[in-house]
Amino acid sequence: MSARIIDGKTIAQTIRSEVAEKVKQRIKIGKRAPGLAVILVGDNPASQIYVASKRKACDEVGFISRSYDLPDTTSEADLLNLIDTLNEDNTIDGILVQLPLPAGIDNVKVLERIHPDKDVDGFHPYNIGRLCQRAPKLRPCTPRGIVTLLERCNIPMNGLNAVIIGASNIVGRPMSLELLLAGCTTTVTHRFTKDLRFHVEHADLVVVAVGKPNFIPGEWIKPGAIVIDVGINRLENGKVVGDVDFAQASQRAGWISPVPGGVGPMTVATLIQNTLQACEEYHDPDIGNN
C-alpha cells in the first residue's frame, strides 16, 4: 500500500489566495488592509529565513507588514516597550516575536506582553486557555494548520486514536487540545514515555514533532494510519527530512505529510489567517477594541 500525500504546499497556497481575496474585498468597501508587525531580535540565520517567509506571505496577500530587526544587544525592557507601543497602534492587528530570543530575555514575559487580541502566534496564556475551554479565539499556528490540513483533505478525526510525539509548548501541548476539540482520543508522549513503539503502533493518527531526523521508523506505523510529520531537519548532505522515516512509513500509512512541503507552509498560512481574523473580529472600527 502506498500512502496518499497530504500536500501542504498546495493547500497553503489556496488559503493564501482566499485571504488575499478577502483583503481585496475589505479595501473595495473602504476598510484598511490588515497589519502585521514582525519583530526579530538578533541575527539567527534560521530565524531570518522564517521571518523572510512570513513577510513575503504578508506582501502576497496584501497585508501591511512592518519589520523590526533589532540587534542581539537589545534589552528586555526595550523589547517590552516596543510591544507596548504596537499594542496601542490601531493599524497593527498582529504582533509576532520570532523565537528563540537571545539569552537574557524572558520568552514568557515577552509573549505575555502581547495583547491577546494581537497574539497571532496563539501563544498567550489567554488564547491557550480559550482553546482549553473549547472556545478558541486566536489559535497556535502549527496545530491549527495541521487540523486545517486534515479538514481540507476530508479526513474525519472524530473517534480517532491520536498519538502526539513531543510535548512542546509550540506544537505538542496545543496540538493535544486541538485534537481533543476535534473528537480524538488523544495521547501525548514525551521523553519519559515508556514503550513509545506500542503507542505508535496503535495510533490511527500520529503527529510527530521532536526535531530528530527519521526518529520514528516506518515499520512502527499502523497500516492505514494518518501520519503528520512536523519535523524539519537538515542532514550533513544538505537534504531536508522529517522526524519520520518517510520511505518506509509511506508504504504503510493511509495518508502522510511530506517534508518539505507538508506542515511547514501551513504554519505561515495559518499566521496569515490569524492576522485577518484579528483584524476582522477584534479591530475593525465598527466592532471596537475588546
UniProtKB/Swiss-Prot annotation:
Keyword Ion transport part of the UniProt annotation: no
Entry EC number(s): 1.5.1.5, 3.5.4.9
GO cellular component entries: cytosol
Self-association state and partner proteins as the record states: Homodimer.
Entry-linked Pfam families: THF_DHG_CYH, THF_DHG_CYH_C
NCBIfam families tied to this protein: PRK10792.1, PRK14186.1
Similarity comment: family membership: Belongs to the tetrahydrofolate dehydrogenase/cyclohydrolase family.
Record's protein name: Bifunctional protein FolD
Pathway: One-carbon metabolism; tetrahydrofolate interconversion
Function: Catalyzes the oxidation of 5,10-methylenetetrahydrofolate to 5,10-methenyltetrahydrofolate and then the hydrolysis of 5,10-methenyltetrahydrofolate to 10-formyltetrahydrofolate.
Gene3D superfamilies in the record: Leucine Dehydrogenase, chain A, domain 1 (3.40.50.10860), NAD(P)-binding Rossmann-like Domain (3.40.50.720)
Binding site for NADP(+): 166-168, 232
Molecular-function annotations in GO: methenyltetrahydrofolate cyclohydrolase activity; methylenetetrahydrofolate dehydrogenase (NADP+) activity
Catalytic reactions of this protein: (6R)-5,10-methylene-5,6,7,8-tetrahydrofolate + NADP(+) = (6R)-5,10-methenyltetrahydrofolate + NADPH; (6R)-5,10-methenyltetrahydrofolate + H2O = (6R)-10-formyltetrahydrofolate + H(+)
Organism in which the protein naturally occurs: Proteus mirabilis (strain HI4320)
Keywords, sorted A to Z: Amino-acid biosynthesis, Histidine biosynthesis, Hydrolase, Methionine biosynthesis, Multifunctional enzyme, NADP, One-carbon metabolism, Oxidoreductase, Purine biosynthesis
Biological process terms in GO annotation: L-histidine biosynthetic process; methionine biosynthetic process; purine nucleotide biosynthetic process; tetrahydrofolate interconversion
